[in-house]
């Protein structure tokens, strides 16, 4: 699992409620302004955390947005 500091712009976010054995947080789509190769990341950010978890890295905003909505759909089905 890769951990990154969250000091970039959050473009989209969707809350994820706490459940048995899980914490509340949000699924995020992040733009890393200092990265040229894969500037867009989707991941999960726990409430109060300063780092995201389970990041998927993308070179285009379109692909990152698709992954963001797929993560949101997966989380909705889990609830």
Predicted regions mapped to residue ranges:
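Short intrinsically disordered terminal tails
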Residues: 1-2, 74-79
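Negatively charged, low-complexity tracts enriched in Asp/Glu with abundant Ser/Thr
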Residues: 1-21
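Short aromatic-glycine-(Arg/Gly/Cys) micro-motifs in beta-strand/loop hairpins
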Residues: 26-55, 71
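Positively charged, low-complexity intrinsically disordered regions
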Residues: 13-14, 24-27, 78
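A short, charged, amphipathic alpha-helix used as a generic interaction element across diverse proteins
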Residues: 53, 57-75
């Amino acid at each position: 699992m890769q951990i990154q500091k969250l000091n970039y712009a959050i473009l989209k976010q969707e809350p994820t409620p706490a459940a048995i054995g899980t914490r509340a947080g949000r699924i995020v789509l992040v733009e890393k302004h200092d990265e040229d190769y894969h500037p867009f990341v989707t991941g999960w950010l726990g409430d109060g955390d300063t780092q995201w978890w389970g990041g998927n890295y993308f070179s285009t905003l379109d692909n990152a947005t698709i992954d963001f909505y797929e993560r949101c759909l997966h989380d909705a089905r889990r609830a």
